[in-house]
């Protein structure tokens, strides 16, 4: 874990521990007056005890060094996940006043993360939930996703998020529908596999 906030590390440790996630290294770079996020990130890539790298960012000071490290991390199949403050105007102002770092608009940061293979997350909790899901896995080609759910409301939230990410929501194949029918599971004709009443 690399953080631009020292105080937040305590909260991050307890949240990670609650999910059974340990940390090989915890580094706070503060306002990066000495070490930068990119420099520490580069060191973590070669650390055998580190399987995934989590970033807590208030702003991005040296985008080039982070980008270069991200390329190396990708080659070593070590995912980088980042939670960045300052997605709103108020959040950007606070981040700048606290660390003095460049707090770019959310869309700019999202594009930067996507370009360099960094997985950006919108919620702090997601920072801890994602590593087990992405470690050692290659991104699947294509942009089609089938959603299996036990709640219509939750599925609608997922569908919303998929649409925002430019992913296509597709229904189950005829083969899957037939397999479910043989198990006495009937699903609707829509693009979701809703098992609420199954």
Which sequence ranges carry the predicted segments?
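Catalytic-core regions of core metabolic enzymes
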Residues: 2-198
């Amino acid at each position: 874990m690399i953080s631009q906030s020292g105080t937040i590390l305590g909260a991050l440790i307890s949240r990670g521990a609650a999910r059974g996630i340990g940390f090989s290294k915890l580094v706070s770079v503060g306002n990066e007056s000495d070490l930068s996020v990119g420099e520490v990130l580069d060191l973590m890539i070669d650390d055998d005890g580190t399987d995934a790298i989590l970033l807590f960012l208030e702003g991005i000071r040296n985008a080039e060094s982070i980008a270069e490290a991200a390329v190396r991390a990708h080659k070593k199949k070590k995912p980088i996940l980042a939670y960045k403050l300052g997605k709103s105007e108020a959040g950007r102002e606070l981040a700048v006043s606290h660390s003095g770092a460049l707090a770019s608009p959310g869309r700019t940061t999202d594009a930067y993360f996507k370009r360099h293979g960094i997985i950006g997350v919108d919620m702090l909790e997601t920072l801890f939930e994602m590593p087990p899901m992405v470690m050692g896995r290659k991104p699947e080609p294509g942009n089609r996703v089938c959603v299996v759910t036990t709640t219509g409301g939750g599925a609608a939230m997922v569908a919303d998020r998929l649409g925002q990410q430019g992913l296509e929501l597709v229904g189950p194949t005829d083969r899957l529908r037939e397999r479910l029918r043989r198990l006495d599971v009937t699903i609707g004709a829509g693009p979701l596999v809703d098992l609420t009443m199954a």
